[in-house]
Amino acid sequence: MVKLTMEPVTRIEGHAKITVHLDDAGNVEDTRLHVMEFRGFEKFLQGRPIEEAPRIVPRICGICDVQHHLAAAKAVDACFGFEPEDVLPAAYKMREIMNWGSYMHSHGLHFYFLAAPDFIAGKDRKTRNVFQIIKDAPDIALQAIELRKNALELVRATGGRPIHPTSSTPGGISTELDDETQKDLLKKAQRNVELAEATLELAVPIFEENIDLVNSLGNIETYHTGLVKDGVWDVYDGIVRIKDKEGNMFREFKPADYADTIAEHVKPYSWLKFPYIKDLGYPDGVYRVSPLSRLNVADKMPDAAPKAQEHFKEFRENFGYAQQTLLYHWARLIELLACAECAADALEGDLSGEKFPDSLERQAGDGVGIVEAPRGTLTHHYTCDENGLITKANIVVATIQNNPAMEMGIQKVAQDYIKPGVEVDDKIFNLMEMVIRAYDPCLSCATHTIDSQMRLATLEVYDSEGDLVKRI
């Protein structure tokens, strides 16, 4: 047995490593994605007042903090007896604007800083990074920074702060927009529509030039899951829709019923669990949540996003029910445009209505909140007692749900490229990393750090006795 190790996986949010196990003939026997980080936020929440949850859980992550805040807020709403449609309309719309702003920030970060170097900065490991893009194409870098800055202003105004928002309250929201601020945010959202279109104009030809790689690298067939509202793409509210491997409707369920459909498998080498559809078992029930999944399960984009709808229509005509892993990047940019259009449309409307309920009554029991985080479906489930204290918390993040698919994807790359007699180098491992990057996994949170020395990428080769043979 020979073991190949790549540590860390680069240009992702967090720290992971890949190990490839070869038999004595040099054939791939097994491929594993190891996640070494551990969080205990569910335990942190126990004993805390339920209304504190939306202020605590954003610290799980500095990138998808808004979605943790909103999923928690929706779970808290339920514990106070509010259905999503009971939230005051102006507050509901403010929460949506916060969500769209966070999406633009996250999707912009992923494409320009994490994914684009694989397609723009060349194949040399030393230049395959955002710094090379800044050097070779400073205009593109400035475009990325402007897009993300505008997006964070939307989050700041609606969430109370640009990172780790605090504004959502039971059944409402605490922030207000004066006329001047709303007009300024509208201009920023409209500018982001232009920047999102420019990003698609830049990216689509690159994807088309690499279509052979798109159609071959790490592709697997799975079920896909995402929120829809009356069949329309939605990232804040709706029902959960699952489609099977052929794109047929498999199931739709209300967020509160998620535990009836989803189960988790455990493997000893990773802190992450391996979710699957309970009725189908593991691994037959492996599913994905992602920008691509959301496009796959939706019938159309919102009426407020006509430009994104045109891109969605073209994407569907070209790829149908898409399973190609690298198409995540394309789908992500269609969503980037949709979020900018939806935010601009909302900011043109009236946001001056009441944003806080007249009365609140805490209820003992369970509350479940589901939103679509940039990486996929996010669930917060809290149980509270008669005093309003949390007795149990369960948080199911997108990356956990994509964990089985990521591992299956890198296994396929290893089997396709690692053969007896073929020297395994950085280029092959980068292809595995490209598969993982497509999912945009979020493995770390804002309260954890990695020693800087661990950021140096190494490729290690061990012999059948477990001795180190070579380090690259």
Curated annotation (Swiss-Prot):
Keywords associated with the record: Metal-binding, Nickel, Oxidoreductase
PROSITE patterns in UniProt: NI_HGENASE_L_1, NI_HGENASE_L_2
GO molecular function: ferredoxin hydrogenase activity; nickel cation binding
Source species, domain of life: Archaea
Cofactor(s) this protein cannot do without: Ni(2+)
Enzyme class name: oxidoreductase
Native species: Methanothermobacter thermautotrophicus (strain ATCC 29096 / DSM 1053 / JCM 10044 / NBRC 100330 / Delta H) (Methanobacterium thermoautotrophicum)
Keyword Metal-binding: yes
Main function: Part of a complex that provides reducing equivalents for heterodisulfide reductase.
Family, per entry: Belongs to the [NiFe]/[NiFeSe] hydrogenase large subunit family.
UniProt-recorded name of the protein: F420-non-reducing hydrogenase subunit A
Gene3D superfamilies: Cytochrome-c3 Hydrogenase, chain B
The protein's assembly and partners: The F420-non-reducing hydrogenase is composed of three subunits; MvhA, MvhD and MvhG. It forms a complex with the heterodisulfide reductase (hdr).
Residue numbers binding Ni(2+): 61, 64, 442, 445
Entry's EC annotation: 1.12.99.-
Family matches, as InterPro entries: Ni-dep_hyd_lsu, Ni-dep_hyd_lsu_Ni_BS, NiFe-Hase_large
Keyword Oxidoreductase in annotation: yes
